[in-house]
């Protein structure tokens, strides 16, 4: 039941954000569209930002788990493609603060990047290596936002993914090892 209920809430969230923009969507609107009670909604999510996090974490996790995602270039290409294929993301970039979409993108890419590198190297990152990953992901989150908003529209996701991968120092160019 929980997977089905979360899926309904997620689908309602996506439809409402596409129609109204993120800022104008409320938890009450999501509950009404998903046809779930307040108790049910809050059993799974704290607020609409939590639904946003669930939605995009699921979306990006699915891209990452894709069998064609073997290199960082593949991963960057998938991120750019996924962002371009989901125009509802545009209004999410208007959010600010702790629960903002920008913060989600940074945190997600940082955690995922750190996991990829540590898995490939078979050890935890040093403080300097962690700094490098965090710095790259901060800039990468900003570029992903600009990409979603139409900047660099002359580039395909493949071209953008290749360009992003070329920026990375050679020692960080690792294969993606899935567990």
Task: List each model region and its residues.
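Amphipathic alpha-helical packing segments from all-alpha helical-bundle domains
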Residues: 98-144
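An amphipathic alpha-helix adjacent to DNA-recognition modules
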Residues: 2-14, 18, 23-35, 42-69, ...
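Regular secondary-structure segments
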Residues: 14-17, 60, 64, 84, ...
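C-terminal peripheral helix-coil segments that are non-catalytic and often amphipathic
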Residues: 149-179
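Cytosolic nucleotide-binding catalytic cores of signal-transduction proteins
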Residues: 18-20, 33, 124-131, 149
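Short, hydrophobic secondary-structure boundary micro-motifs
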Residues: 25-26, 91-95, 156
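Short, residue-level hotspots on alpha-helical faces of the histone-fold
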Residues: 11, 54, 58, 107, ...
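Amphipathic alpha-helical segments used for helix-helix packing
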Residues: 55, 78-117
């Amino acid at each position: 039941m929980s997977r089905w209920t979360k899926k309904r809430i997620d689908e309602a969230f996506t439809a409402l954000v596409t129609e109204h923009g993120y800022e104008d969507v409320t938890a009450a609107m999501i509950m009404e569209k998903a046809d779930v009670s307040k108790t049910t909604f809050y059993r799974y999510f704290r607020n609409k930002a939590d639904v946003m996090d669930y939605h995009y974490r699921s979306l990006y996790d699915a891209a990452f788990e894709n069998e064609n995602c073997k290199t960082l270039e593949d991963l960057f290409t998938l991120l750019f493609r996924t962002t371009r294929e989901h125009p509802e993301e545009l209004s999410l970039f208007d959010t600010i603060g702790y629960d903002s979409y920008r913060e989600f993108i940074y945190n997600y890419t940082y955690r995922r990047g750190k996991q990829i590198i540590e898995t490939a190297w078979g050890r935890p990152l040093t403080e300097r290596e962690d700094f490098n990953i965090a710095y790259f992901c901060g800039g990468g989150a900003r570029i992903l936002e600009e990409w979603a908003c139409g900047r660099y529209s002359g580039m395909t996701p493949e071209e953008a993914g290749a360009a992003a991968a070329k920026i990375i120092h050679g020692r960080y160019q690792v294969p993606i090892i899935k567990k």
